[in-house]
């Protein structure tokens, strides 16, 4: 079944054999300043393989996906510390894309750098996600982002279609708080964490952001091939929905990450637009996210 058509219908659980939803590419990089023994490198290689397997082989939902319908995503893990054998600290960059209708183009839906990556992994370990159970921090991080990626993807195809998957991600946050690792609690000084990432998506005040995600992709990106000017107008209109959020919740991680990840795409889409249209768009983006004014100005180049 065509993925776009499927998501516009009421979601109905399927029985029987389940396909997997994600096509995840995993890369692990160790900082040059970190010494890595041959034994440690072997563990890291095994961890990469196990991460790839859990992301791509787990059936995260009850929906069926054809191979070509799987969500393309990337995990880039930057290891900055190895305090003990099999223990790792660093960052994880998570991104996902979705195809534009009637085109080979892929639009970035989610792009986020999580600075609270902490994981332990033993040689020969197998990562296995069990719903409603906390097993270890690494499994929780991976399951959280699997559901968040799926939620964002579904939101881009159907209005608030990702709600069940954001709820799953929120449940993972609640359970993972018992593990004591960073990134899961509202009390942390760094608000760019997993708690706020998913909590925001389920708060009523952020509903305009979810409408923006849908309008930007479904009414904007998906229209560019056949109705380019209408698509561009829909994209600009989608960003206008964000003003009430940023007026009360400035620098919100979800919105800022979304805008930041769309800059190159916007520059390409509006490259042939009138200068006034580009200037209006840039002024809006600067108003929404003043901290990245210089970045948004590149759309005018």
Predicted regions and their residues:
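Bacterial Sec-dependent N-terminal signal peptides
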Residues: 1-24
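Sec-exported extracytoplasmic/periplasmic mature domains
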Residues: 52-60, 151-154, 267, 271
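Acidic/His-rich structured neighborhood in mature extracellular/periplasmic domains
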Residues: 84-199
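Soluble non-cytosolic domains of exported or imported proteins
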Residues: 38-46, 136-141, 253
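A cross-kingdom marker for long, charged
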Residues: 25-29, 213-301
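Flexible, glycine-rich surface segments
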Residues: 158-251
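Start-of-domain marker
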Residues: 21-89, 100-102
């Amino acid at each position: 079944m065509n993925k776009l058509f499927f998501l516009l219908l009421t979601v109905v659980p399927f029985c029987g054999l389940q396909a997997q939803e994600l096509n995840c590419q995993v890369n692990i990089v160790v900082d040059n300043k970190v010494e890595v023994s041959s034994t440690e490198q072997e563990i890291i290689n095994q961890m990469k393989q196990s991460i790839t397997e859990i992301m791509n082989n787990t059936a995260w939902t009850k929906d069926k996906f054809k191979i070509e319908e799987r969500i393309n995503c990337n995990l880039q893990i930057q290891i900055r510390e190895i305090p003990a054998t099999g223990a790792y600290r660093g960052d994880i960059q998570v991104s996902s894309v979705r195809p534009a209708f009637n085109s080979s183009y892929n639009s970035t839906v989610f792009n986020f750098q999580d600075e609270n990556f902490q994981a332990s992994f033993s040689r020969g370990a197998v990562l296995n996600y069990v719903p409603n159970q906390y097993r270890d921090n690494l499994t929780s991080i991976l399951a959280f982002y699997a559901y968040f990626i799926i939620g964002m993807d579904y939101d881009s195809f159907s209005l608030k279609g990702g709600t069940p998957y954001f709820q799953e991600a929120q449940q993972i946050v609640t359970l993972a708080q018992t593990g004591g690792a960073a990134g899961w609690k509202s009390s942390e000084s760094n608000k760019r964490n997993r708690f706020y990432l998913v909590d925001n998506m389920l708060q009523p005040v952020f509903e305009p952001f979810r409408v923006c995600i849908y309008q930007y992709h479904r009414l904007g990106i998906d229209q560019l091939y056949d109705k380019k000017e209408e698509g561009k107008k829909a994209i600009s209109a989608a960003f206008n929905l964000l003003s009430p959020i940023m007026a009360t919740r400035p620098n919100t991680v979800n919105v800022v990450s979304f805008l930041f990840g769309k800059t190159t795409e916007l520059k390409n889409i509006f490259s042939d637009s009138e200068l006034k249209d580009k200037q209006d768009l840039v002024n809006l983006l600067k108003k929404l996210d003043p901290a990245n004014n210089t970045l948004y100005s590149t759309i005018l180049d």
